[in-house]
Every structure is written in structure tokens, then in C-alpha cells.
Amino acid sequence: MQIAKILLSAVKLFPLDYLIPEDLSLNIGDLVVVPFRNKELTGIVWEFSNVPEVKKLKTIKEKVPLNLTITSEVLDLIKWMSNYYMAELGSIAKLVLPVDIAEKPIKVKEQKINNNFTLPDLSEEQKQALQMLNDSNKPILIKGVTGSGKTEVYFYLIAEYLAKGKQALVMLPEIALSTQIINRFKERFGFDPIIWNSSVTKAQKKMILRGILEDKVKIVIGARSSLFLPFKNLGLIVIDEEHDDSYKQDDGVLYNARDTAIVRSTFDKAQIVLCSATPSIETMYNANIGKYSVINLSSRYKNAVLPNIEMIDMTKEELPKNCYLSNILIKAIKNNLENKEQTLLFLNRRGYAPLMLCKSCGHKFTCKYCSSWMVVHKSSKKLECHHCGYQSKIFNSCPECLEDESLAICGPGIERIEEEAKTLFPNSKIAVISKDHVKNPEKIAQLLHQMENLEIDILIGTQMITKGYHFPNLTLVGVVDADLGSNHADLRSSERAFQLLHQVGGRAGRGNSKGMVYLQSYYPDNIIFSYIKDEREDNFFVNELEVRKAADMPPFSKMASVILSGTNEHKILEVAKNMVRIAPEAQVKILGPASSLMSKLAGKYRFRILIIADKKFNLQKYLKFWLELIKIPSFCHIKIDIDPKSFY
């Protein structure tokens, strides 16, 4: 009797066996409707086997209408991800089919491609870049200064693939970034791209999946999950802002969408293009060893000039209590307002203040579920944990010593900078962009429209505003706390700080007027600032690679992280210690166990073991063997993170 193994997103570990009806002809990759518990689900035909008659097996009901199939290339990607990231097949299947499409056929509107595109003229440098893109058969890095027109170059490439009848995917790290790109796309190509991100409804996702499976959708702009869409005829993948940490998923299936996209491009025989003004260290390493081709765009588009960058030594500033904008920056903002030009104030910290404490007994308000401070949000009049979302009221007296009027709010958040700016510049139009202030694409689009139409004088933003936005009249950027994030005990803290400051500075002077960037710092001699100030990003990459090589850290080695978590701190630590004690002998370096930087998260205590090995070592095989040696207690949850990006 022939059995089909059906991969279901509802079953994480392995495909389930189903009987094949005699009148049903199936192929690997076909989408079928199967009974599962008390409902019917869509599954993927994974493989076939012949077994003696089995009475208890359920029978496949039918093929999904229109005989839709998942290509062998996507199936290969699922297998690769399961092996490389040590993830359950069903969890990866849910990435490919996030909604069930086992329903009556949905009428999908086909994207009408008009090849008479109105693309703008390219500069000579951009034309050379396009020629290199056409000539290369490797992954390509477009490394261009902020505002160099990387988007215009890959728009030309998209046009070429659409003319060939191919599908194209443009990946962006944030939903917020998509608004301006979509508008530019519609302006250039004359039709709407399909958008795929967390704001897309379930019904819309069903329609999009159908359209892709029927090859009616030609161009998708999406977040990291768009990588798993079941394209039939994928010709091009573009990863914009490839360095961004948002491409790494830290829950569910732990994967890096950038790295997985490169693998997918090999399966689909598609061209892949990585874009960034500040590429990741891993990408620069691959470029240096010849694995990737590199295109350098050294000039800003339409001859715009790069901004000047100046340090402000905050140790020499005498500021009033609870004020955070230096006299130099205030004067520059006043100048900008007089010249009718826009200003961006950047602080990568949400809320009003990062800490509330008691001046009498020293009590700090921390999250009851996490090892983190509660952030003061004045606008909502609440304390909030930015890790698990727990909220509480703002107290009038200390809950520990009961002292009245003893509570102090420490440090600035973005709301506090807004308050200070409104006091200093009462007649200016001020807006704030952060996850708390703009929670959906419509709000973002509205704010961007206001910026473009000069309805905002001062924009105050978190890292949301650093990625790819183009405001021609924005000529001044003030970084309120340039030290934030640069001194963390983290492999990538210097890299992240450099990228963030470089990107936010790149928002200034993208139009006809030259820009100015001020970095406020209590440690102005930090070497990172000199790299940014003197436009020596290549020196930064060389130095950072040397540091990593000396420490035998990625990209010169492989790394995996084993995270153990549970509600009993002592028991979890004992499991972690025992795991290290029985680790198989091999050419690996094992560090830990140690408390994660976030030692308690959502009520669970967390310990981390790091494993470092030579690049040629089969780390996954080693980890599988190691995990088979230990019986994991039910109170302990284990996650494997291959190529970890953070250590929180």
C-alpha cells in the first residue's frame, strides 16, 4: 500500500503518514488537503513509501484546487534550514505556508507588467554598477555611501528581470521602510508591488500565496518572512540594508534571513544582491575573500555632498538639571529653524526615562518577570518592560520604604527629548517616530508625508528613522547620546554602534544643501567616532576584522549558542552544568554556562553555553550527538541558535 508523508505546519517534528486514494495521482511538493484531528489542513507531499496495509491511517482527501505545488527548490530550502538551523520541519513549513489555503479557489488578480518603465537616468558610476551586476555570477554587495542611489540601481535590475518574465523579491528589515520604497516603486514602474509583512491580514496572505503559486505575482517587497514565499520563477533577490539585525529571527525558528536568502538563490538559480552603506562584518569578510563581488558607489546621487560630522564633548557642557541638549546643538537647531530647514534628533531609547528609583532607599523599579528596569512612559502614565510588555502604574511613593516624594526619574528617553525640544522651540512643529508613536504603516506613511511636505520642523526618532529614509530638506542631525550601545559586553557592539551612527548621520544633507551631524558624547575619544567623523569606514572594517581574527571569533570561526531556560533558576543551572560536564571531546571551545545578559525573561531564568569551532567543523552534527547524551527534564526548555547575533 502506498503511503504519502505529508508535511504539516501543525506538526513540528516530522511529516505524518496518510493513505493515497487509488484515483489520486500525486507528486512530491503537491499541496493536498488532509484530515487532522477534527479539521482539514493543507499539507505538502514530502515523500512516498510502500508499507503493508495499515488500518488506522487516515486518507488524503484531495489536492488543493488548481493543483498547486511547492517547487523542488523550496523543498530543498526547507531541508537545508532544518539541517543547518536544527529546526523542526513543521515549523519551517509554517514559514512557507503561514495560512491555510485549503478552501475554494480564490480569484487572484494578476500583476499587469508594463515594460515602458519611467526609470530616471543613472550617473556614470551607477551605470558601471549596473553593468557589473549583469556580468557577475556571484552574490553581489552594493556598498554605497548613504544617499548614493543604491535603490535606483537595483530598480533597473528589477526592470530587466520583469522584462524576462521572472519574479523578483526585495527584502527590507522593517515594515517602516517599505512606505517610501513602495511610493518610489509605483512612481518608477506604474503599478503596485505586493507587500508581505506582519501587518498583512490573513485573507490578504491567502490571496498573495495563491497569486505566487499561480505565478500571477511578479514583484514582492517584504520583511524577512517574505523569503519563504513559494515563488515558481524567482529570478532576483535584493536584500536592502543587509547589515540590519532585524534579519535575524530570535523566536520560533532561529534563522538569519540574509544568509538563508543566499542559500535560496543557489537553489532557485536566482541572482542575489546585498545593499548597505555599512555592510556587516561577515559580508565584508566574504567580499574580501572573493566569495562575493563588490560594487562601490562612492558619490551621493545627483552630486549631493556628504555631511560634516562634529563631536560635542558633554563633559565640558554645563547643562541645567534634566536637560540633555548641548548649547552647541541648541544653537544649530535655532539656525536651522531660521533657514526653514529640517532637523532630526536621534536617541535610541523609547519612553520618557529608562529608570525610576527611590532617592531614600535606592529601590529600583524592575520588571516582575524579567531582569530589566521598567521604562517610564509619561504619555501613557505607565511603567513598561520593553522585553515582555508587562506594565504597571507610576507610583507616587516608594513601595519598599513607603517614602513620599522620594522617586526620581533617571536619564532621557525619546519622550523626554520631545518635552525639552518643545520647551526650547515652542513655535516649531515637532513630531516623534518610535514603535510607541507609529504602530502601523498608515501612521508611518502619514508622518513621512508630513516630513516630505515640510510640515515638520524637528523630527525626534529612535533607530526606526535610521534606515533608508530620504528627506531632501533635512540638513541637521543631532545624536543625543552617541555612547549608547557602544560599550556593551557583546561581540558585535562596536559594529552595531558604528553602523547605527553612520546610518543616522546619513539622513542629513541628501538634497541641495550640505548637512551637519553632531554627536554628543561623554567619551569623545572613542575610536569609533574618529572612523565616522573622518569617513574612514574601510579602516573600521579592517580593524574590526583584525580584532575578530585575534579572538578567533566569527567570521573566522563557527559559533552556536545553547540557551537553557525555566522557572527554577537553580535547577536550570544544574542542567546546564551537567550538559557541559558530559560534552563530547572534540576540537571545540565551550564557554559557560553563564547567565544570559537578560538573565530572566518573561518569568524564565536563562543560561547560555557558547560553542566555538573551526569553520570546517560540522557543528550541527556535534550538537545533535551531544543533545542525545542528555535527557532534558520537562522543566527545562532548550533552544539552539546557530550563528547567534546577540547574547541577551
Curated annotation (Swiss-Prot):
Residues 131-297 form the Helicase ATP-binding domain. The gene is priA. Keywords: ATP-binding, DNA replication, DNA-binding, Helicase, Hydrolase, Isomerase, Metal-binding, Nucleotide-binding, Primosome, Zinc. GO terms for cellular component: primosome complex. Zn(2+) 2 binds at residues 367, 370, 385, 388. It comes from Rickettsia bellii (strain RML369-C). Residues 393-548 form the Helicase C-terminal domain. GO terms for molecular function: 3'-5' DNA helicase activity; ATP binding; ATP hydrolysis activity; DNA binding; zinc ion binding. SMART domains: DEXDc, HELICc. This is Replication restart protein PriA. It catalyses: Couples ATP hydrolysis with the unwinding of duplex DNA by translocating in the 3'-5' direction; ATP + H2O = ADP + phosphate + H(+). SUPFAM superfamilies: P-loop containing nucleoside triphosphate hydrolases. A motif (DEAH box) lies at residues 240-243. The keyword DNA repair does not apply. Component of the replication restart primosome. Initiates the restart of stalled replication forks, which reloads the replicative helicase on sites other than the origin of replication. Recognizes and binds to abandoned replication forks and remodels them to uncover a helicase loading site. Promotes assembly of the primosome at these replication forks. ATP binds at residues 144-151. One of its GO terms (biological process) is DNA recombination. Its cofactor is Zn(2+). Belongs to the helicase family. PriA subfamily. Zn(2+) 1 binds at residues 358, 361, 398, 401.
